[in-house]
Each structure stands twice: as structure tokens, then as C-alpha cells.
């Protein structure tokens, strides 16, 4: 094939140009992400049961729906949360690769079976089924800079004017408003109700009857009488629109003709639909809308579309109102991709310099460099065809591929120049002769590297997604690299290289190149003597190799494990939890103290603080608070002001707060997999021991975790049990008094729980009507005595006649995991420890808990456990594939052993480098390790291929091995050094995405250094030992190790 294109160079140019054109067009179409869709698809079910407790929601809603979800295809696990405000969320997580649309349809079908079994109030509120991920993409805030609007005004404006266009934006999966729109609030006065012998049920019935929209029909509607000349629509009663209209609702007409209207027994006016959440931006009144990304949507495209939507709405904002983005996860995407692109450019420059140093021929260097854009652009074309995106993983793979793809071109150019020098052939003939020699080695290298990396593409789970990005990208680049080396590079060599006189290869004697050549030649001579010594003393060096293998195994066992390295995402969370039963006012004091510290003491690091009272990731309630902290851009912060340093300083300060627990934590590397770094585990009541015992086990776990030196920031992702007032109805007493249980329950629900009646029209938008007791009538248990129920005789009976209560404790938030009650616990490894070590410690502590209490990993921890179990199989498959490919290539079962034996020599270096830098055995490390295995095997192939040919030509095993080493040392050193320097920018990167770059770069550089330095000495030993062991025949005229050429180093 190469000969065809050597004779037709323009044909080769056309192919290269077409490849580049296709790649350039693909770049314009490829989406840009920080990561591909790593998180498994998740379908969320959201329900509201007004006035219900967390236990009531769990018993009457959650369990009913959960029981129907069984049997859905590819369902991985189900988790649920029930809150004391009546809200509930069930999240069904599916196996990676499941079509989210199909999953949503199946969930909806199962939900249809459960809906008739749910309380009527729940069905009336509606059930939402959405495709969503755990984390927020960004938060859109409205802030009143002049203080002219309250938080309730801003929340109403968001819901009324911004929520709909934002929810329609492509890529938006779900959203959460920090606040609520206006509602018509009817505040009942129990004393006035009793005075007029009315009950809350009477009021609700009257409002429902008189606030209606009537369809009154038409005059002259069809079918009509003959001769009808008029057709007109009849406008009947419409929904009420103002507080005055509601105040005029007639409740009662007395015998004397006097009337009791709603305004006589209640205060009516616009108010918040609920008052659970309030927000501030840098201390100013604000409201916000947190957006979640739809499953499979592109983060950058969605964020861009949302900003354009807000830009279109801004001209219509009220005076003094400004839109802000107090939390945004997309800047890290653009910064990290930009950083990797810079790394890519730096890698190309460094590789060019290394090639020029060794080739010492500008034309030869240009030839090898010209292959880079062809292969890289061609790879983008393959990524587009495979449905991939431009993301951190594919760009990392491109950086690794640079060193690999120039290897093939270097081997071609180097060998062409060697043939011209040794045989005195002109460039065209030398190229043909050279390609006959190295074509097999090039194909072999491509097969081996593909064999190492392709098994990664077949693994499942989130780890499999990461592996596939690397695998397909590098294998595609390698495949194109070999094609270019067989098609384009020979054509360039035949037409661009100048002829060399015999013996002129690398003969520069003056200047820097002369100094370099002299020293390199001396090194080659010393290297030949060393190889000769090793081949004469095989046993000690084979024992040394065995020690290396033992050391590799020992290091593998000691290096800490993790899933992904931590990243500075430019954002930080702070979570506030005041004592159980605390009021919102008490929580706000702590939130204000936290905000003041961040904005004043950390002004060099923090850009803005958006605080929310009434909500955090652990749950909702008056004792909960949250802060979304945006940091300044990476180039404005030093390492001392990284998100991790800030979190550590802030946590130390928050420990001084006596009236609350405050945790500062960074988001995880992959935001789709959760809201915090570290581990995520559920303690489960598998033995049915009950809530109290589960709470005791949780507290026991937290106490032991606090004593562990391996764990830090261990906290429940839930709320502590808080005071609850248990109201007991004496059914017999109530019956004797003529009061029905239905009237009692309805009165309680309306007076204390805020009962939804129906809707009204406010400025052209449909909003809700709520009835509730006025605040002064529901502040303490004694206020229950103010409420009355009418009996069958028309008498007003106070609650104290048939009800009594007592204080108990209960949870404001209940969680379930895979069908059993559970409690979620979050935490992080202590400084100096990895998540793998932290998870092992969690398993140890969980094993000491009372019987009946189990645990299950979830989120990123689930993926980490899955990836750890896959690693041995991945390595075994990769090594097996390498062996089989080499066996097919060499038609030998023994020769491949000499190549495979080099693998530990690369792994040991990767382990040492990773350990010395304090990094972990994570997914990136494993990708780098597999790359190192392929490169180590590549170096071995370059020696073994030539040694095998020389031996078949009649050389002894010893002579063939040493001659192959001498011939291939320069290209091995050159390609290895080019690859190492190409990866150096990854190891010294800073800013966004630096953690990932360090993780992959450190292991690869360490592995390549050891694979190069050690392999050039051990590979000839492996070749000779394996060939001797399996009975390779020596030629009759043997050249013994005592031959003087070994001593002369020739």
C-alpha cells in the first residue's frame, strides 16, 4: 500500500486534506461539555400533600407509589424524601445507557396505577414526573438593589413572569423557586367565627361555591330554530379577582335578614402561596430559581440559552430589580476545556522540539509535525460520527494521542534516513525499502495499543462512559496515525527529504547538535556493553525483575483508591442546621453571620453569596439554611485561595458558631452525581427495627465517625427529630357531643394546615386561594381551644371538649432507599486520605452497628465501588488482548511473552510517581496506566520485531538482540521523550480541571520513564530468555557473548 502512495504523492495529499476538512467541519458541530453524560438516567416524581406530616406523606403517598414501581426495566435503585411541609420526591435511577424517554414512560405508566390509591388532596395538587439530575446547573436570582420590592414581591414576579419561559428553554429538566407566587390568603379569626356560629368548613364551602367560572352557553346556538337571526355568547359568573370581591362573599343570612360576609370573620389579601423559603443576595432582598439540567442535555448550550432568555426579559423588569447568577457551574466547563486546549498546543510545541533535537533535520521534523493536524482533525470527525462531544475526557485523550501519533511518523522518518545513510539509496527508493522493514511493526504497534484500550469501551456504568471517551478517542487517533504513516508520511519522505550520503545519518560534529550526538553515541556504546553484561548474567537480572513485580504488587495494595480527583469548580456550598424546632428568625441570624464572614474575611476569594433560609440539601424547614458561594475567577486566585482552602478556613470559623452546625463543602468533580465531594451512604432499616432504633444507629455511626482520623465532615443528610404535638381525638366523646370525625379533621386541616380552595385571576394569571387561621390563633397548643366545630344540633363545640394533646418527637424529613426506611450520611476523607480509604472506614463502622441495620452506597460512591470491582477484569482483558494480537502478528505463542513481560516495568513507575505526589488510584490513573502498558509494549515491539528478523536472517539470539537494541535505541528514546514532554503540561496545570490533569499526567509520565529506562535493558533479556526457553534454534555459526564486539560496544 505504501508503495502505491509513494509513487502517487498527490493522491496521498488529497486523502490528508479530505480528512482535515471533514474534521474541521465536525468541530463546528460538536457540542462542548465538561464531561459526557456520566450520571445514570434518573426520573423524579414530585408530589405535594398540603398540611401533611412527613410520616403521613411516607405512609399514604411514598409507599403506595414505590410498591408500583417494581418491575421497571433496568431500574438500579429508588430513593425518596418526605418532608413535614407535605412535599415529597421519589427518584428512580436507572442503569447507564437506558433511554431516559423510555424510562419516563414506564414510570408514568406505573404511576397511573398508583394515582387512584393516593389521597384526593394529592391528586388535586397534581403529580409531576420529570427527567432530572441531582444537582443544580445554575441559580437565576432577582435582587432589589434599592429595596423597593420585598422577597415575596420578587418571588411572585419570578413565578408569574419568568418561570414559564425559563421552563420552556431547551435543556431545562426541572427547577425550584426559592419563594412562591402570590395567592389570595384568607386569614380566619376563630373568635369571630364562633360569634357568628360559623366554622372553617363553612367558609371553605362558601368560597368554593361563589368563586367559580360558569360556562353559561349561547343564545341562538345550534341546533337553532328556523329563522334565527342572533347568535351571542352568554357571560356568566367569573372567578373573583380582588381581595374586596372575596371579602364580599356571603357566608350566612340570619333570620332578621342581616348578612355575614367573609370580611366579617377574616382578613383577606394577597400574600405568599407559602412562606417556607426566603432568600438574599449579598444581604439584599432577593428571590431565585434553581435550574436542573435535563438528562442528556448540554450544559453549556442550556446555560447560554437561559442567559439569552433572561436578557430578553430584563427590559420588562420593575425599576431597581436586577438579574444575577449567584451560582453557575458552566464557567468551569469553558475554563477547563480552554486549559486543555492550551495544554494541547504546548504538547505539540514540545514534541516538535524533541523531534528536531533527535532528527536534526528541519524537513524531517516538519514531516512528522504535519501528521499532527491530519490525525487530530480526523479524530474529531470520528468523534462526531460516534455521537461524542468535545469534553475534558476527549481532550485529555487528544493530549495523550499526540505523543502516540507522532511515534509512527518518527519511526518512518527515522528509518528512511537510516536506510539512506546505511545503504546510500535516494529518498524515494529508501522510503520503499524502509516501509518494507517497518510496516509490520507499525501495524503491530497499532494492534497492541488498540488491544490495550479497546476493552475499556465495553465496560458499563458511569466508569464505562469515562473509559469509552478515552478508548474511542485514542484508538481512533492511533488508527488514523497508522494510516497516515502508511499513506501520507512515506509520500512526504519520498518528496521532501534530501538525499544523504552513506554514513551521514546524525553526523553533525559542530555546535549543539555535535555535542548532543557525541554524548548520545557514547551513551549508545555504554548501553550496548550493559546489555551484553545483562545477557551474560541472566539470572540476577531476572531475579531483579521478580523484585520489581513484587514491589509493583505491594504498591498497588498500598496506594489509596478513589473514583475521580477533586476539582476546584469555582463554587462552594455552606449548609446551616440550627437546633431542632428553631424558628426561621433564629436560623436567619446564623445565616447572616455566615454571610458576613464570607463577604468580609474572604473578600479576596469570594465573589458573591446567595443565602436561602428554609432550605438546604439535607431538607426543608425553619431550622435549615443554605449558601451558594461563587468564587472569583481562577486567574484571580492563588493556590491558597482555592475552593478547598476556602472550605477548610470557613469550616474552622463555622466551628465557633455555638447555636448551629454549619458545613462548608465543595461540589464533586462530576456534578451530575451529587452535591458534595466525599462519600454518600444510606443506613437502612433492613430488619424492621423502627425509626427510633434507626436514629440511634445513625447517632452511633456519627459518634464513631467523629473519632476516626480517616473521616471528616461526616454529617446526616437529613434533619434531626424535632418537637411535634400529638393531637388525640376522643372518638366516643366526639360522637356523644354530636360532632363528626370528618368535620374535626377538615377543621384542623383548614385552620392549621392552610387548605387550598380553588383559583382566582390576578392580573391575567391563574393563582390559588388558601384558607388558614390567622397567626395568633395557631402559635401554641392552647390556641386549639379557640377553634370550634358545629355539632348536629347546631351548637358550637370547642376542641377542648373532645381533644387532648402531648409533646412528642418526630422527624421533619423521612428517607427511604430501595423500599426500606433509611438515613443518608455524607462525609469526606480527612486530609491525606482518599475516598477509597474513607469508604473502607465507613464499612468498618457500619459493620459494628446493631443487627437489623444495613447500608448501601449511592451516587458517586456507588460508581466508585463499581469501578473498583471492574479494574481487575479490565487489566486482565487488556493484557490478554495484547498477547493474542502479538501471537497473531508473529505467528508465535512464545514471542508475545517477551513483550507482555515488559508491562510491570511501566506500571511500577506509574505507581511510584502517583504515590510520591500523594495522588490516588482513580479512574484517570487507570486510564493513564493502560496507556503506559500500551506504550511499554510498543517499545518492546520495536526491539523484538527487529531482533526476530535479524535472528531469522542467521544472527544468534544474543547478536540479534544487541543489534536490535542498537538500531532502535534512538527512535525509542526520541518517541518516549516526545510523549513524556507532551504530557508534562498536564502535570503542571493549574486552575479549572487541574486535578484531573495531574491525575492522568503524573501516572503516565512516571510509567513512561520507568518503561523506557528499564525496558531497553530488560526487553533483550526477555527476548533471549523466552526464545531460548521455547527452543529457538541458533544458527550454525554462532556469535557468542564473548565476541569482542560486545566489549567494543559496536
Swiss-Prot record:
Name by which UniProt lists this protein: Antibiotic efflux pump membrane transporter ArpB
Induction of synthesis: The arpABC operon was not seen to be induced by carbenicillin, chloramphenicol, erythromycin nor by hexane, toluene or p-xylene.
Residues annotated as transmembrane: 10-30, 339-359, 370-390, 393-413, 440-460, 472-492, 539-559, 871-891, 893-913, 923-943, 972-992, 1004-1024
Keyword Transmembrane helix: yes
One Gene Ontology term of the molecular function aspect: xenobiotic transmembrane transporter activity
InterPro entries documented for this protein: AcrB_DN_DC_subdom, Acrflvin-R, MdtF-like
Purpose of the protein: The inner membrane transporter component of an antibiotic efflux pump. Confers resistance to numerous structurally unrelated antibiotics such as carbenicillin, chloramphenicol, erythromycin, novobiocin, streptomycin and tetracycline. Is not involved in organic solvent efflux.
GO terms for cellular component: plasma membrane
Bilayer topology annotation: Multi-pass membrane protein
Keyword vocabulary terms for this entry: Antibiotic resistance, Cell inner membrane, Cell membrane, Membrane, Transmembrane, Transmembrane helix, Transport
Protein family: Belongs to the resistance-nodulation-cell division (RND) (TC 2.A.6) family.
GO BP annotation list: response to antibiotic
Entries under SUPFAM superfamilies matching the protein: Multidrug efflux transporter AcrB pore domain, PN1, PN2, PC1 and PC2 subdomains (SSF82693), Multidrug efflux transporter AcrB TolC docking domain, DN and DC subdomains (SSF82714), Multidrug efflux transporter AcrB transmembrane domain (SSF82866)
A Pfam family: ACR_tran
Subcellular location: Cell inner membrane
Amino acid at each position: 500500500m505504501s508503495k502505491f502512495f509513494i509513487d502517487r504523492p498527490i493522491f496521498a495529499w488529497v486523502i490528508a486534506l479530505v480528512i482535515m476538512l471533514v474534521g474541521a467541519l465536525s468541530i463546528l458541530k460538536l457540542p462542548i461539555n465538561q464531561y459526557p453524560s456520566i450520571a445514570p438516567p434518573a426520573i423524579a416524581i414530585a408530589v405535594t400533600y398540603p398540611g401533611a406530616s412527613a410520616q403521613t406523606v411516607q405512609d399514604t403517598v411514598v409507599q403506595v407509589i414505590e410498591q408500583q414501581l417494581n418491575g421497571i426495566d433496568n431500574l438500579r435503585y429508588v430513593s425518596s424524601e418526605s418532608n413535614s411541609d407535605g412535599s415529597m420526591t421519589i427518584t428512580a435511577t436507572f442503569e447507564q445507557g437506558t433511554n431516559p424517554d423510555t424510562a419516563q414512560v414506564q414510570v408514568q405508566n406505573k404511576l397511573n396505577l398508583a394515582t387512584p390509591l393516593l389521597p384526593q388532596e394529592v391528586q388535586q395538587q397534581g403529580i409531576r414526573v420529570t427527567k432530572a439530575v441531582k444537582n443544580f446547573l445554575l441559580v437565576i436570582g432577582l435582587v432589589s438593589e434599592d429595596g423597593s420590592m420585598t422577597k415575596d414581591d420578587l418571588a411572585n414576579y419570578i413565578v408569574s413572569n419568568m418561570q414559564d419561559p425559563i421552563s420552556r428553554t431547551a435543556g431545562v429538566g426541572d427547577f425550584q423557586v426559592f419563594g412562591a407566587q402570590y395567592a389570595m390568603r384568607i386569614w380566619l379569626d376563630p373568635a369571630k367565627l364562633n360569634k357568628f356560629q360559623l366554622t372553617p368548613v363553612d367558609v371553605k364551602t362558601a368560597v368554593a361555591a361563589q368563586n367559580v367560572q360558569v360556562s353559561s352557553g349561547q343564545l341562538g346556538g345550534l341546533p337553532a330554530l328556523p329563522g334565527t337571526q342572533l347568535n351571542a355568547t352568554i357571560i356568566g359568573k367569573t372567578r373573583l379577582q380582588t381581595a374586596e370581591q372575596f371579602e364580599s362573599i356571603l357566608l350566612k343570612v340570619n333570620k332578621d335578614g342581616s348578612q355575614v360576609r367573609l370580611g366579617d370573620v377574616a382578613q383577606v389579601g394577597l400574600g405568599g402561596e407559602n412562606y417556607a423559603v426566603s432568600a438574599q443576595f449579598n444581604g439584599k432582598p432577593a428571590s431565585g430559581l434553581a435550574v436542573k439540567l435535563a438528562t442528556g442535555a448540554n450544559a453549556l448550550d442550556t446555560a447560554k440559552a437561559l442567559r439569552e432568555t433572561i436578557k430578553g426579559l430584563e427590559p420588562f423588569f420593575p425599576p431597581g430589580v436586577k438579574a444575577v447568577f449567584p451560582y453557575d457551574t458552566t464557567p468551569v466547563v469553558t475554563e477547563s476545556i480552554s486549559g486543555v486546549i492550551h495544554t494541547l498546543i504546548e504538547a505539540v510545541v514540545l514534541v516538535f522540539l524533541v523531534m528536531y533535537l533527535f532528527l536534526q533535520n528541519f524537513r524531517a521534523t516538519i514531516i512528522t509535525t504535519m501528521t499532527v493536524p491530519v490525525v487530530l482533525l480526523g479524530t474529531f470527525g470520528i468523534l462526531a460520527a460516534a455521537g461524542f462531544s468535545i469534553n475534558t475526557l476527549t481532550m485529555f485523550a487528544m493530549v495523550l494521542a499526540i505523543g502516540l501519533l507522532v511515534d509512527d511518523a518518527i519511526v518512518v522518518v527515522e528509518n528512511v534516513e537510516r536506510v539512506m545513510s546505511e545503504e546510500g539509496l535516494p529518498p524515494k527508493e529508501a522510503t520503499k525499502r524502509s516501509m518494507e522493514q517497518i510496516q509490520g511493526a507499525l501495524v503491530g504497534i497499532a494492534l497492541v495499543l488498540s488491544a490495550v484500550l479497546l476493552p475499556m469501551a465495553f465496560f458499563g456504568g458511569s466508569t464505562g462512559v469515562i473509559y469509552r471517551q478515552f478508548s474511542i478517542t485514542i484508538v481512533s487517533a492511533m488508527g488514523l496515525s497508522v494510516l497516515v504513516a502508511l499513506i501520507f508520511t512515506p509520500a512526504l519522505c519520498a518528496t521532501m527529504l534530501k538525499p544523504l550520503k552513506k554514513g551521514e545519518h546524525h553526523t553533525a560534529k559542530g555546535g549543539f547538535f555535535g555535542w548532543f550526538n557525541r554524548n548520545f553515541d557514547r551513551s549508545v556504546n555504554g548501553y550496548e556493553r550493559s546489555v551484553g553484561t545483562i545477557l551474560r548474567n541472566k539470572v540476577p537480572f531476572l531475579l531483579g525483575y521478580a523484585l520489581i513485580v513484587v514491589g509493583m504488587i505491594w504498591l498497588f495494595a498500598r496506594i489509596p483508591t478513589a473514583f475521580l480527583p477533586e476539582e476546584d469548580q469555582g463554587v462552594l456550598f455552606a449548609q446551616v442546621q440550627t437546633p431542632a424546632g428553631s424558628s426561621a428568625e433564629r436560623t436567619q441570624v446564623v445565616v447572616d453571620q455566615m454571610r458576613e464572614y464570607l463577604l468580609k474575611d474572604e473578600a479576596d476569594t469570594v465573589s458573591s453569596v446567595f443565602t436561602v433560609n428554609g432550605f438546604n440539601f439535607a431538607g426543608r424547614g425553619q431550622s435549615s439554611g443554605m449558601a451558594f458561594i461563587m468564587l472569583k475567577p481562577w486567574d484571580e486566585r492563588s493556590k491558597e485561595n482555592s475552593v478547598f482552602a476556602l472550605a477548610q478556613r470557613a469550616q474552622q470559623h463555622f466551628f465557633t458558631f455555638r447555636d448551629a452546625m454549619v458545613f462548608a463543602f465543595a461540589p464533586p468533580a462530576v456534578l451530575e452525581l451529587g452535591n458534595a465531594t466525599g462519600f454518600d451512604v444510606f443506613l437502612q432499616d433492613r430488619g424492621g427495627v423502627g425509626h427510633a432504633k434507626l436514629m440511634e444507629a445513625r447517632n452511633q455511626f456519627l459518634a464513631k465517625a467523629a473519632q476516626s482520623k480517616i473521616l471528616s465532615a461526616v454529617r446526616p443528610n437529613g434533619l434531626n427529630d424535632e418537637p411535634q404535638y400529638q393531637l388525640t381525638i376522643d372518638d366516643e366523646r366526639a360522637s356523644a357531643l354530636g360532632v363528626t370525625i370528618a368535620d374535626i379533621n377538615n377543621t384542623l386541616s383548614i385552620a392549621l394546615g392552610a387548605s387550598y380552595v380553588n383559583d382566582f385571576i390576578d392580573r391575567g394569571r391563574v393563582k390559588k386561594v388558601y384558607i388558614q387561621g390567622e397567626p395568633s390563633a395557631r402559635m401554641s397548643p392552647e390556641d386549639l381551644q379557640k377553634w370550634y366545630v358545629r355539632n348536629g344540633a347546631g351548637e358550637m363545640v370547642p376542641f377542648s371538649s373532645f381533644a387532648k394533646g402531648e409533646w412528642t418527637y418526630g422527624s421533619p424529613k423521612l428517607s427511604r432507599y430501595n423500599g426500606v426506611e433509611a438515613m443518608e450520611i455524607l462525609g469526606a476523607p480527612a486530609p491525606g486520605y482518599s475516598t477509597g480509604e474513607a469508604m473502607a472506614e465507613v464499612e468498618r463502622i457500619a459493620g459494628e452497628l446493631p443487627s437489623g441495620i444495613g447500608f448501601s452506597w449511592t451516587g458517586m460512591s456507588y460508581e466508585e465501588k463499581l469501578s473498583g470491582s471492574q479494574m481487575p477484569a479490565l487489566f486482565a482483558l487488556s493484557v490478554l488482548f495484547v498477547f493474542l494480537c502479538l501471537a497473531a502478528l508473529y505467528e508465535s505463542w512464545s514471542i508475545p511473552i517477551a513483550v507482555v513481560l515488559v508491562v510491570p516495568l511501566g506500571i511500577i513507575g506509574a505507581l511510584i510517581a502517583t504515590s510520591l505526589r500523594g495522588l490516588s488510584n482513580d479512574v484517570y490513573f487507570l486510564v493513564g496506566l493502560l496507556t503506559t502498558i500500551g506504550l511499554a509494549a510498543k517499545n518492546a515491539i520495536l526491539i523484538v520485531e527487529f531482533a526476530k528478523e535479524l535472528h531469522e536472517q542467521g544472527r544468534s539470539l544474543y547478536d540479534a538482540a544487541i543489534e536490535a537494541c542498537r538500531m532502535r535505541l534512538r527512535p525509542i528514546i526520541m518517541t518516549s521523550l516526545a510523549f513524556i514532554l507532551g504530557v508534562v503540561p498536564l502535570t503542571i496545570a493549574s486552575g479549572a480541571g487541574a486535578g484531573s490533569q495531574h491525575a492522568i499526567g503524573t501516572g503516565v509520565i512516571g510509567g513512561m520513564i520507568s518503561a523506557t529506562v528499564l525496558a531497553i535493558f530488560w526487553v533483550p533479556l526477555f527476548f533471549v530468555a523466552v526464545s531460548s526457553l521455547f527452543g529457538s534454534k541458533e544458527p550454525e555459526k554462532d556469535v557468542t557473548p564473548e565476541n569482542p564486539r560486545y566489549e567494543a560496544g559496536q
